[in-house]
Amino acid sequence: MLIKVFGAAVQGIDATLITIEVNSSRGCMFYLVGLPDSAVKESHQRIISALLVNGYKMPTSNIVVNMAPADIRKEGSAYDLPLAIGLLGASETISSEKFSHYLLMGELSLDGSIQPIKGCLLYTSP
């Protein structure tokens, strides 16, 4: 199942809308594409821990995450929340019908709590 979640990337004092597409299909691999930095790539482990600690099951399918536009570098752990929500939507654990109404950003701790992020006011302007 393909779903879309929205986040943002800060460049200087501007924010650019980032579309996070999550697709779930047969298999059991996780792929993250779209110019993520190492902190974004590491989000996979934080997301797994946060979901398991809170009683969600990890999908036993291939997960492909595309962060577009691909030419903008995605930096930091603030993509944890939209990636986790996208994963839950793609696995049909939660309803994804209203995802297009929200821009999600937030770092997840291993227990699933949402941690503060830098530049949150800039995210309101994409």
What are these regions (language model features)?
Residues 1-125:
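Peripheral, non-AAA+ core regions of ATP-driven protein-machinery
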